[in-house]
């Protein structure tokens, strides 16, 4: 994922 966001980073 984006990496900078805990939720989007996991995707």
UniProtKB/Swiss-Prot annotation:
Disulfide bonds: none annotated. Expressed in the CNS and midgut but not in the ring gland, thoracic perisympathetic organs (tPSO) and abdominal perisympathetic organs (aPSO) (at protein level). Keywords: Amidation, Neuropeptide, Secreted. The keyword Secreted applies. It is found in: Secreted. The modification Arginine amide is found at residue 11. GO terms for cellular component: extracellular region. GO terms for biological process: neuropeptide signaling pathway. Myoactive peptide. This is Tachykinin-related peptide GLGNNAFLGVR-amide.
